[in-house]
């Protein structure tokens, strides 16, 4: 790191748990930045032309991982344990109460965006991107209450026992 404040903090961190991390970028960023005219127009309309979105393009993340970031294949390891929780699917059935955790409208949106992604995705990130850095602690259905999948939205909410799992892990 180039910032003199960080080594002291880094030396004290023993474990990081990342929820659906974007270690490998997302094809959704590729689509809204450099996709067909419909995808780019949609990205513009929704305000997804920012530098943050550009940096999540798969090719940009490949470059970061190859040159700068630690913990990915063929790179130095991280100074402390980096564990990930991977979300593998999205459910948005109107009759299923689980679909409302984190907001039903968000689930529907992630069902749509899942069409640009692999069959294993949380609606925003492919499982391969989420599991690229560090060690996978678990993939959603293997530990969540009821074996429920965690969408990208749900992995940031109080859904399916996730907060208790995190609390018990720490």
Question: Where do the PLM segments sit?
Answer:
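Helical cap/lid subdomain of alpha/beta-hydrolase-fold lipid enzymes
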Residues: 3-170
């Amino acid at each position: 790191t180039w910032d003199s404040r960080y080594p002291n903090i880094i030396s004290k961190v023993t474990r990081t748990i990342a929820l659906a991390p974007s270690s490998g970028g997302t094809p959704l960023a590729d689509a809204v930045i450099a996709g067909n005219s419909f995808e780019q127009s949609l990205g513009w309309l929704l305000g997804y032309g920012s530098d943050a979105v550009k940096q999540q393009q798969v090719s940009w993340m490949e470059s970061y991982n190859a040159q700068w970031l630690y913990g990915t294949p063929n790179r130095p390891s991280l100074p402390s344990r980096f564990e990930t929780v991977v979300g593998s699917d999205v459910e948005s059935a109107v009759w299923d109460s689980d679909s409302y955790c984190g907001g039903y409208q968000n689930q529907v949106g992630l069902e749509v965006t899942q069409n640009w992604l692999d069959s294993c995705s949380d609606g925003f990130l492919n499982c391969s991107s989420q599991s690229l850095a560090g060690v996978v602690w678990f993939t959603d259905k293997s530990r969540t209450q009821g074996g429920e999948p965690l969408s990208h939205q749900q992995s940031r909410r109080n859904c399916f026992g996730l907060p208790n799992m995190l609390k018990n892990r720490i």
